[in-house]
């Protein structure tokens, strides 16, 4: 279980080595190692993975749309080659009612990766705190313009490309969501946008963060939570607010979010290490507890098992109706949507080359991660 984080910094701020030494020592301990990671999907056995049959059609529509987006061609090409977010959309929403809605969600996923890349390690705003604040303010304004009480779908003049492209995407979401879901999505997007800025401050800190603190802020503000609400858009239903705020549903959302963070940090470990992005839970556990790479990976895998079990148990406490089967169907679909955020992220990670090469994955879906530097 996670410890109390009230005093988490006490063990790191008194460390003898300098912040530079701390990072250098961690890099030296991990570099050159290889580790075989078991199938992440096997750790969530009751949650199957499917792919929407219209994935190729969505890809075709994305190919038509991308040239119209005001984002650097190099960035578009990189994400198109390595990401395949149309496929990610198809595993997140395998039963989406309309292909047109699936295309809108795919555009949203392209937006979130484009936008996050501006601020994440290696982006234009990675070291620019003032620029990041301005970017977040402009993006938050877009969210309120499109999803607030007085909708305005016209981006301000000279908007940055990632803000400009977001206006029509949110317009389409609003057209297909009920008022309760629209407001939920608005608030969740604000949490995500503000959370990215908060994570940037952590990365800019002199010392590596405590893993439990890092896990908490990422789980609180991670971008998958809006994608859960978008399942209501995909499946054409609106979950009543009392069901969404029921303690069991809150726990399922939180636990699936935590699962997504945990499994993503395992599967992205090789890429992030090679990018010298050390704010990864595996590496942070190595640093905090002086663990070997194997022990740190095992710790994260154990956390996946733990949070999966909590999530499965919570389903029994949901507010099932005795006489409204439509409501029960909507609850089941909402829960499946939460689960697919975890399984879909894993399935997609194995199926594209954003984090590692296909040649590193065997027929058991085990992946051999390689923490060597590659020019």
UniProtKB/Swiss-Prot annotation:
Keyword Metal-binding attached: yes
Residues given in the record as Mg(2+) 2 binding sites: 116
Keywords for this protein: Lyase, Magnesium, Metal-binding
Cofactor note: Binds 3 Mg(2+) ions per monomer.
One Gene Ontology biological process: isoprenoid biosynthetic process
UniProt pathway: Secondary metabolite biosynthesis
Chain residues that bind (2E,6E)-farnesyl diphosphate: 354-355
Enzyme Commission number(s): 4.2.3.-
Subunit field text: Homodimer.
Domain characteristics, as noted in the entry: The 2 conserved active-site motifs D(D/E)XX(D/E) and NSE are required for coordinating the divalent metal ions that stabilize the PPi moiety of the substrate.
Described function: Terpene cyclase; part of the gene cluster that mediates the biosynthesis of the brasilane terpene glycosides brasilane D and E. The biosynthesis starts with the activity of the terpene cyclase braA that converts farnesyl pyrophosphate into the sesquiterpene alcohol trichobrasilenol. Subsequently, trichobrasilenol is glycosylated by the O-glycosyltransferase braB putatively using UDP-GlcNAc as sugar donor to yield brasilane A. The latter then undergoes two rounds of oxidation performed by the cytochrome P450 monooxygenase braC.
Protein name as catalogued: Terpene cyclase braA
Origin species: Annulohypoxylon truncatum
Phylogenetic classification of the source organism: Eukaryota, Fungi, Dikarya, Ascomycota, Pezizomycotina
């Amino acid at each position: 279980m996670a410890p109390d984080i009230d005093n988490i910094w006490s063990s790191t701020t008194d460390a003898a080595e300098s912040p530079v030494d701390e990072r250098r020592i961690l890099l030296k301990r991990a570099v050159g190692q290889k580790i075989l990671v078991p199938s992440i999907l096997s750790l969530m056995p009751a949650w199957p993975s499917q792919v929407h049959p219209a994935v190729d059609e969505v890809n075709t529509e994305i190919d038509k749309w991308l040239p119209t987006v005001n984002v650097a061609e190099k960035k578009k090409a990189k994400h198109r080659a390595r990401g395949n977010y149309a496929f990610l959309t198809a595993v997140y929403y395998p039963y989406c009612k309309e292909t047109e809605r699936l295309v809108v969600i795919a555009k949203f996923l392209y937006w979130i990766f484009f936008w996050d890349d501006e601020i994440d390690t290696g982006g234009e705003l990675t070291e620019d705190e003032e620029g990041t604040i301005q970017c977040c303010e402009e993006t938050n304004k877009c969210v309120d313009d499109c999803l607030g009480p007085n909708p305005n779908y016209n981006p301000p003049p000279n908007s940055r490309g990632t803000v400009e492209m977001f206006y029509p995407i949110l317009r389409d979401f609003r057209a297909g969501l009920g008022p309760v879901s629209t407001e939920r999505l608005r608030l969740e997007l604000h949490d995500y946008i503000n959370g990215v800025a908060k994570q940037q401050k952590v990365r800019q800190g002199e010392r590596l963060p405590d893993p439990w603190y890092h896990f908490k802020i990422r789980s609180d503000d991670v971008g998958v939570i809006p994608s859960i609400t978008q399942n209501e858009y995909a499946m054409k239903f609106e979950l009543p607010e009392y069901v969404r705020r029921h303690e069991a549903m809150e726990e399922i959302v939180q636990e699936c979010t935590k699962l997504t963070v945990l499994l993503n940090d395992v599967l992205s470990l090789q890429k992030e290490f090679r990018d010298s992005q050390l704010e990864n839970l595996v590496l942070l556990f190595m640093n905090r507890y002086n663990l070997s790479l194997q022990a740190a990976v095992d710790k994260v895998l154990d956390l996946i098992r733990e949070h999966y079990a909590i999530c499965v148990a919570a389903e029994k406490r949901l507010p099932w109706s005795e006489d409204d089967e439509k409501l029960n169907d909507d609850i089941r679909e909402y829960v499946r949507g939460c689960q697919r955020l975890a399984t879909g992220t894993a399935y997609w990670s194995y199926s594209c080359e954003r984090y590692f090469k296909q040649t590193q994955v065997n027929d058991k879906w085990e992946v051999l991660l390689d923490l060597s530097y590659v020019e």
